[in-house]
Amino acid sequence: MDFENDQLYNWLQLANLESFYPNFIKKNVSCDSFLSFTMQDYGNVGITSLQDRKKLFHLLQQLKKQTPPISNTSSPVINSNNNNNNNNNNNNNNNNNNNNNNNNNNNNNNNNNNNNNSSGLRQPTSTSSLLSNNNLMSTQTQQSSSSSSSSSLSSKSNSNSDFMQKAQQLLKQRELERQQYAKQQQQQQSTQTKYQSSLKDFDITSSNKNNNLDDFFEDDNLYSQQQQQQQQQQQQQDFEFEEEEEEEDQQQQYDEEEEEEEEYEEDFYKEDLGEIDDGNVLDISDDEPDPNSSCIIVEGSPDEEDDDVEYIPQNESLVNGFGSMKIQQQQQQQFQPLQQQQQQQQQQQQQFYQQQIQQQQQQQQQQQQQQVQQQQQQFNNFNYSGLNEEQIKYYQQQAQYQQQVQQAQQAAIQQAQQAAALAQASQQQLQQQEQQRQQASNFFLDMNEYGQRIRVCVRKRPLNKKEIAKSEKDIIEVLPKKDLIVNEPKTKLDLSKFIEKHKFTFDGVFDESANNYQVYLHTAYPLVDSIFHKGKATCFAYGQTGSGKTHTQMGQQGDGLYALAARDIFHRLETYFKDQLQVCISFFEIYGGKLFDLLNERKKLACRENELQNVVIVGLSEKHVTSPQELMNCIIDGNKIRSTGSTGVNSDSSRSHAILQISLKNIKTNKLHGKFSFIDLAGSERGSDTYDNDKQTRKEGADINKSLLALKECIRALDQSSKHTPFRQSTLTQVLKDSFVGNSRTVMIANISPNQSSSEHTLNTLRYADRVKELGTSESNSNKKPVATYNIPAPLPPPDHLKQNFNDPILIPSTTTTTTTTATAINSQQPIIQQTSQPVSKIKQPVKQQQESQIPQTPQQQQQQQPPQQQPQQQQYNIPQTPQQTQQQFNIPQTPKQQQPIQTQPPMSPPKIDFVNYHRNHVDQFADILKKELISINQFESSKGSIPLENYINNIEQFLDSKQLLINHLRGIIQQHQQQPIQQQQQQQQPIQQQQQSTPQPSQLQTPQQRERARSQLQPPKPSIYSSRN
């Protein structure tokens, strides 16, 4: 062991790492284990700095190259000696052959020691040289120990015995080296004799060079020496190149680690853990958290916190004073109604007249004040000298009288101004009432659409502050007519990126510019009327955590669905059902499959069913409320004790399902008249998305997903109209049983996130909502009786801070003429092919064309969009014409007065065609057909004769027909584009021809018989490629 420790010390000394030698001894590191060191073992020995790690790495690489793998069971010393013999033999070949083997070995060993001491780590060292160094070190230590003290005889004897053992080992090594050297010389001699014998047959005279054999041998020796030198140089270069590559790799690794640590520290100190990223929801102080609060704080990296937070749209946050979010809003006000424009003009005119009247009144007041001041100055400057006392009294009385008159006039003016202000206020009130009446008269909801049992709407939130900082893209396109497209980024097998489009259609789609009042009008407000007709209504929000569910339900400054519904319920109650019904509320949550009362200090509840199989919550407290403000105060108090916490995805995540029930009860009998339930579902999240290892948060997430899965199973059972619906699988489904059974109506608001990283969650939410929508459509198809269209009372106006941004043209009933004409015009332009196989994205037309087709258009635009194919039809068929047209047709000569100038219209620009989208759809549909062909081939081959050949051939013909249809469709579009310039030239030439025909030429006059023959020869135009397909 002493020998191995000395050897290890010498190895570390070569790399200037001898200071770490005690750590190697503590860990009992031997020479063999040292050679098998890895990067992970460096820290166990205390080597942590980058430079020391590099030195140790290069030392291990050099030692591994010098000591090849052990084949026999002999000791490592013998193997190292063999390597040394090979090195020594190579060196001896380069040196003179007359020297002895011992001298050569000694010289080589000395040279190796000197080179190692000088070059450090670049030049490889042999284990024999290390042994010689060990011997020298041992002799020096023995001499120093003998000279220092004469009492340590035992230590000397031990050191002498070690020295003898080492000397014997050296002698054995030298004998082995001599034997190997003798064998090598014999081999060289045999090769030389063979070489010389082969050279004897060489014809020297035939060669052009006048060289002797001796010169040839000398050249050969020189050539062999040069080759050896080149090989050695290449080996050294390769070795240095490998070392440089290893150094660069290590530097890159450590640089990356240092950069990650620096970024982590910068993010940690930059981020304010007490503030939400949006900067619009809360402004929490930087003090320590309150120990009495129910918020659960989970430690984690700063990058993982506040990933997705609840949001506030821009149009609401600006009014509240939170202006940090700067998101562009798409204000589409191209097609405002004429009534709104007229009202705006009238208001502007009234404001202008009022400003002029105010200016005139101010000028009159200033003039009166100037007159009063002048009179006072005259009275003050009046000279009373030379007058009696009676005269002075008389003048003073007159001055006082005039002052009283002036004061009376000023008081009358003030009274008139006050009366004018009151009149203006009353006029404004009347105008507001008229506007409200007009809005109420314009308010219209088609109950065939809004009266469905299950309606599904989607709301998209804007990108938050953190997502904008990460430069994430918005992958969701909200189209008119209740459509939605998700551009999901994907990669193919060849690592080429592409975007897969998914199209969804719902009952209502709201983009990021929509506020809570607009969402309320189209989701929850139609249900308010049903609870007054002894019905039950449910509105629940579903979506990923941080997608805006709680903001939709609660809102800010009384603009959430809770507050807006409470306003309309109490307004309807006071106007129609006063002293008949009263309002009672209950507020509870479902946390971990258990019920807790939020209005009674989280008292535990139980869910049961009565004899009529109706759900009853035992122990639930109800509070009688008389105003919307009192209702909102109860909700705020309940939310304070609701279970929330911070997760890896959202810092303020709702960890429970909160349920608010607004019940209408009869005052006399105390029986239930109607019930409205608002359900704020907890955020759905996957276990792989949670970066914290808290057991409680993972358990909460599992309970949330379990309840949502049970809800999905119930919806599926109702959709399939199965006999048994598993409402008892979860507490959530038991509570929601009334929402899906009986006289009930339900609205689901699916909240989605638009960022690219949440594409999978967004698609899962949309598919979940689409499944619920299918349930509603299946039930509506089963009940084919149409609902009578009736109008419900208009809602209350929006809150003050939402009036500026409120613009909802859907409330005004739209005429059916414009929609039908646009549809026919566009269908004539873009014929639809009967698709044999729908693509995955479910898009039959390009997105741009769908947007154009869904925008309402004026009749002029509709005429401009008519295809050019319809123009010759109007000219050729017998269409009723005006007298001017008949005159032009028969070419009747006209007087100069009758000849009117023909107004030439500029040629219409042809509509732009998006060939890329057409081609992409063509390729997608073609690929689907190819997939079906491959499937049919596999089925026919695997059937082994069970499928008849005729069916297989029929399938082939169908595939070919569908391919031909796709090809013809694309060719038709290309031909239509190529014919557009020709049609434009014809349109430009028509007015010129009409001018030429208007001149009287007797040769052009036709008889009636000729005209009849010409009409009989006229034929209708041939049908185009698309006429049969439309």
UniProtKB/Swiss-Prot annotation:
Annotated region described as Disordered, given as residue ranges: 66-164, 178-308, 826-915, 981-1030
UniProt biased composition (Acidic residues): 239-290
GO annotation, cellular component aspect: centrosome; cytoplasm; microtubule
Compositional bias segments (type: Low complexity): 81-117, 125-164, 181-197, 225-238, 826-839, 849-906, 981-1009
Major subcellular site: cytoplasm
Entry's Gene Ontology BP terms: microtubule depolymerization; microtubule-based movement; mitotic spindle organization
CDD domains named among the record's database cross-references: KISc_KIF2_like (cd01367), SAM_KIF24-like (cd09541)
Function summary: Microtubule-associated force-producing protein that plays a role in organelle transport. Its motor activity is directed toward the microtubule's plus end.
Name of the featured protein: Kinesin-related protein 6
Organism: Dictyostelium discoideum (Social amoeba)
Lineage: Eukaryota, Amoebozoa, Evosea, Eumycetozoa, Dictyostelia
